[in-house]
């Protein structure tokens, strides 16, 4: 007997190719990358290039070794390498982030079966790997604090590349939502949960809102492979991400790392959330 499984609604009613989705995210990250290069100089540019080369290089090697179709032009390896570079400090040696980019694609992506099959976001998995392998080098020089409105535009206390300009990350995320390349439920529930819970606990939003946090909200948490496909599941997932971010940030005093570790833990339970929020089939019963 052959079974055919269809994912729960909403279903896309127009042609949107994965390649288009990926490249749209890359384009959205370009202004953020440019701001990082402007602020940090050639160190940032070198790390971005090294991370992308590591990701693209290992993709080429793996697909050639196993006689698979080369998919470099779909942009996925480029995107994963770029995203990893943005959540690393500019002081990280280029050879380390090259290894990180290779780890993201070689282990985080292909070891789990390739695009569409991984449990953890590959860039996030690579960030954790780098943090464990070279903990001292991965420590940001500073923790960003928004002391004035101008810090939203250009943050002088940026620790990671993406922390340079939180407003650019926010604008990029909002634009992707407006063009429907990002579904709004996860970012909204994640953002609201984090802000409300942080205020309840008495943490100033200046400590909470950073480029890394917003990148997590709009780009990492919304990764379609590692987040639930159900509408209710996405809301629950966003709430969980926000809750874990604040709990880690509140007790550690570091909302930047809190964001990334919260997303990693949320990735782990995303399949369970999806299972428990599947819509009741017609004539059937909901998942217990």
Curated annotation (Swiss-Prot):
Chain ranges passing through the membrane: 26-46, 47-67, 80-100, 101-121, 126-146, 159-179, 200-220, 235-255, 256-276
GO terms of biological process kind: electron transport chain; transmembrane transport
Annotated EC: 7.2.1.-
InterPro entries: Ion_transpt_RnfD_Methano, NqrB/RnfD, RnfD_bac
Quaternary structure note: The Rnf complex is probably composed of eight subunits, including RnfA, RnfB, RnfC, RnfD, RnfE and RnfG.
Family stated for the protein in its record: Belongs to the NqrB/RnfD family.
Protein name: Ion-translocating oxidoreductase complex subunit D
Annotated source species: Methanosarcina acetivorans (strain ATCC 35395 / DSM 2834 / JCM 12185 / C2A)
Organism placement in taxonomy: Archaea, Methanobacteriati, Methanobacteriota, Stenosarchaea group, Methanomicrobia
């Amino acid at each position: 007997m052959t079974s055919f499984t269809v994912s729960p609604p909403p279903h896309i009613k127009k042609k949107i190719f994965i390649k288009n989705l990926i490249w749209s995210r890359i384009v959205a990250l370009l202004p953020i990358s440019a701001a990082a290069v402007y602020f940090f100089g050639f160190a940032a540019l070198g790390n971005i290039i090294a991370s992308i080369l590591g990701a693209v290089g290992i993709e080429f090697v793996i697909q050639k070794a196993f006689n698979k179709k080369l998919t470099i032009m779909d942009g996925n390896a480029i995107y994963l390498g770029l995203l990893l570079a943005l959540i690393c400090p500019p002081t990280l040696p280029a050879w380390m982030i090259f290894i990180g980019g290779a780890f993201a694609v070689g282990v985080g992506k292909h070891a789990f079966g390739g695009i569409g099959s991984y449990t953890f976001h590959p860039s996030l998995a690579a960030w954790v790997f780098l943090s464990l392998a070279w903990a001292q080098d991965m420590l940001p020089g500073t923790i960003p604090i928004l002391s004035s409105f101008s810090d939203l535009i250009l943050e002088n206390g940026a620790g990671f590349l993406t922390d340079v300009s939180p407003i650019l990350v926010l604008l990029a995320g909002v634009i992707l939502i407006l063009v429907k390349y990002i579904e709004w439920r996860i970012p909204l529930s994640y953002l609201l949960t984090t802000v409300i819970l942080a205020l309840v606990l008495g943490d100033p939003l200046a400590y909470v809102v950073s480029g890394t946090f917003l990148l997590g909200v709009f780009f990492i948490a919304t990764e379609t492979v590692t987040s639930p496909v159900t509408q209710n599941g996405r809301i629950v997932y966003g709430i969980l991400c926000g809750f874990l971010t604040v709990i880690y940030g509140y007790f550690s005093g570091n909302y930047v790392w809190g964001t990334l570790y919260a997303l990693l833990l949320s990735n782990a339970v995303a399949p369970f959330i999806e299972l428990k929020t599947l819509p009741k089939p017609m004539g059937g019963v909901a998942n217990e």
